[in-house]
Amino acid sequence: MARLCAFLMILIVMSYWSTCSLGCDLPHTYNLRNKRALKVLAQMRRLTPLSCLKDRKDFGFPLEKVDAQQIQKAQSIPVLRDLTQQILNLFASKDSSAAWNATLLDSFCNDLHQQLNDLQGCLMQQVGVQESPLTQEDSLLAVRIYFHRITVFLREKKHSPCAWEVVRAEVWRALSSSANVLGRLREEKA
């Protein structure tokens, strides 16, 4: 009986400790999915960047709001989740399906969906750990404004092939940045 009580106490302490930590451990597969998504996104390119120079635009990716050195790990998970969700919304739209190879688009969206599940699992572990700090809200707002600018750009360009190519390249940079953020967070943990 004493062993059972001791075992239960250890489980409770371990559960409490992991819940109260500054975040969660994303599965190793998250990084693999992110790399695969980047590779597929690169394969989706249909036009050369030179042919779309006239359509290039700086969407103002909020790197300073997503950078691991600026926000803590617990704050970065909701921001990365929102970034991934916005990318999925963009590429899962009916306007997107006409622009890309269906097989590559499905693969890309599936990778994003699996990444969202991983990030959502982290968020569930963080429930109750801390309130949404102002910096996190600023970061989430910056990500949403960034994607609003992308959506407006696509609408203004009538979802042209060059507009989608510009957006594809921009999203590739955003996903690369999110991979770098997670890499720095993992280094800090080690």
Swiss-Prot record:
A GO CC term attached to the entry: extracellular space
Entry comment on modification after translation: N-glycosylated.
List of glycosylated residues: N101
SMART domains: IFabd (SM00076)
Origin superkingdom: Eukaryota
Record carries keyword Glycoprotein: yes
Chief location bin: secreted
Subcellular location as annotated: Secreted
Disulfide bonds: C24-C122, C52-C162
Biological process, per Gene Ontology: defense response to virus; natural killer cell activation; negative regulation of cell population proliferation
GO molecular function: cytokine activity; cytokine receptor binding
Gene3D superfamilies from the UniProt entry: 1.20.1250.10
UniProt keyword annotations, A-Z: Antiviral defense, Cytokine, Disulfide bond, Glycoprotein, Secreted, Signal
Family statement: Belongs to the alpha/beta interferon family.
Role of this protein: Has antiviral and antiproliferative activities. Produced by macrophages and stimulates the production of two enzymes: a protein kinase and an oligoadenylate synthetase. During viral infection, mediates antiviral effect, either directly by inducing interferon-stimulated genes, either indirectly through stimulation of natural killer cells enabling them to control viral replication.
Protein name: Interferon alpha-11
